């Protein structure tokens, strides 16, 4: 394990630990022995890449972790269906399934052609797992209806989808997310909040709230000038919702939105730090979405990929991306950007697509932070030479010092399904805390040609690791 101080760009090697997690069922081809196989793609329909799973989200409560992901990714939009997998032993073993009554490829079949953008949350008050996604009626038109599938048996099964908001004419719903208020002392305990944007109306934000375990949803009032392509809402211990968003072409920085009335109304935007990012090579589909979580004391931590610390003079601006961090106590005021010192500033390593989790049993100077990300050892690579790996950074002192390790890789970007925006591992992935351990869920693969409509071409699946902290 490599331990680094956040205030220094010097790496101090003090020993290496091998973290292992057992796999459930037959191991996927080429899977590393220290990873658990979360799920594999069973679909063989025409029009999608087979044996592909991308874009996993995950959430945890107690000793249970649930992950949702696209299964059978297509070139134009979405996937054959949304899969889920559940672990009741902190990520050691997994049991998977696929949502019913969603797409025409589901069992039983549903009405949508594809599904995309999966996210998952647990509602402790009502004892319900909620898997949210976009149901896409036709491709290549990518938008669709926002829906949630419910599980009342601890993610052993999921029911038919409940539509949160159907997409209307001249709308393009995209980049949804979901979170639930699980603090028993919160005045809004049991509220769940769903978010998405409308690409046909200047990326206007939409929020919706459920207070009955996802059975019914009511629309929130969001300022008419809102503009963002996705983001991650979190909930402070007192019930305030803080929604950090990615504005794309709207502004030069992230923005946050606040609800203090249980999701009835939102105020904002509040300015977050500016973005300074570098495009990723290797024909890989990468966005600069923020990832946020909150500690037990109510501090919000938001991470993203940023190259501001790789500026070495004229002609050498923004050479490679780091993972950076900003914090807030109220969602309105944000700290200066801090570089997570994964590698020296002079290195050629490019880091991107980060996700953060904070152990809710910790806070402040003792907060346990887990950040998972993808990286290239050499940023200036191409489709044939880019070596993609999964990295993990952890801190047990609120971000003052960090321990670094590699979880998986290297992979070639060409092993992953090609989309209209490049080869895809996902626009996001995630990590959760279970019993004080970090459990990231991510996409791995082995060599394949990933030709469209070729049943045996790809070898891409979801995997996890269980990582003790401290």
Where in this protein do the model-derived segments appear?
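C-terminal PAP-associated
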Residues: 21-470
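Bacterial N-terminal signal peptides
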Residues: 3-17
């Amino acid at each position: 394990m490599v331990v680094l101080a956040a205030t220094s760009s010097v790496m101090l090697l003090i020993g290496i630990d091998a973290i292992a997690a057992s796999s459930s069922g037959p191991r996927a081809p080429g899977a590393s022995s220290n990873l658990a196989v979360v799920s594999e793609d069973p679909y063989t329909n025409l029009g999608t890449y087979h044996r592909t799973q991308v874009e996993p989200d995950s959430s945890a409560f107690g000793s249970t972790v649930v992950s949702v992901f696209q299964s059978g990714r297509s070139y134009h939009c979405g996937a054959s269906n949304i899969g889920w997998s559940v672990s009741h032993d902190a990520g050691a073993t997994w049991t998977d399934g696929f949502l019913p009554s969603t797409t025409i490829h589901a069992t039983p079949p549903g009405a949508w052609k594809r599904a995309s953008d999966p996210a998952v949350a647990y509602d402790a008050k009502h004892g319900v797992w909620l898997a949210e996604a976009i149901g896409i009626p036709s491709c290549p038109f990518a938008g669709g209806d926002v829906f949630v599938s419910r599980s009342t048996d601890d993610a052993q099964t999921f029911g038919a989808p409940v539509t949160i908001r159907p997409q209307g004419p001249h709308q393009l719903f995209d980049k949804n997310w979901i979170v639930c208020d699980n603090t028993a002392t919160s005045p809004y305990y049991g509220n769940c909040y769903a978010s998405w944007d409308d690409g046909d109306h200047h990326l206007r934000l939409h929020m919706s709230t459920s207070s009955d375990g996802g059975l019914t949803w009511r629309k929130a009032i969001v300022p008419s000038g809102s503009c963002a392509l996705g983001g991650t809402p979190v909930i402070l211990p007192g019930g305030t919702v803080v929604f950090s968003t990615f504005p794309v072409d709207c502004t030069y920085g992230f923005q946050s939105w606040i609800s203090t009335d249980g999701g009835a109304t939102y105020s904002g935007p509040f300015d977050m730090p500016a973005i300074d990012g570098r495009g990723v090579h290797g024909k890989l589909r990468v966005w600069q979405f923020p990832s946020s979580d909150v500690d037990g004391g109510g501090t919000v931590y938001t991470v993203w990929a940023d190259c501001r610390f790789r500026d070495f003079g004229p002609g050498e601006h923004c050479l490679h991306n780091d993972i950076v961090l900003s914090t807030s106590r109220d969602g309105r005021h944000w700290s200066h950007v801090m570089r997570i010192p994964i590698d020296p500033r002079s290195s050629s390593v490019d880091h991107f697509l980060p996700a953060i989790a904070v152990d809710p049993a910790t806070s402040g100077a003792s907060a346990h932070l887990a950040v998972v990300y993808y990286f290239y050892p050499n940023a200036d690579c191409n489709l044939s030479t880019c070596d993609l790996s999964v990295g993990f950074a952890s801190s047990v002192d609120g971000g003052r010092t960090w321990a670094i390790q590699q979880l998986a890789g290297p992979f070639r970007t060409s092993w992953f399904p090609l989309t209209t925006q490049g080869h895809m591992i996902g626009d996001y992935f995630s990590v959760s805390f279970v019993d004080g351990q970090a459990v990231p869920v991510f996409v791995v693969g082995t060599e394949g040609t990933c030709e469209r409509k070729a049943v045996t071409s790809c070898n891409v699946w979801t995997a996890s690791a269980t990582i003790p902290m401290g």
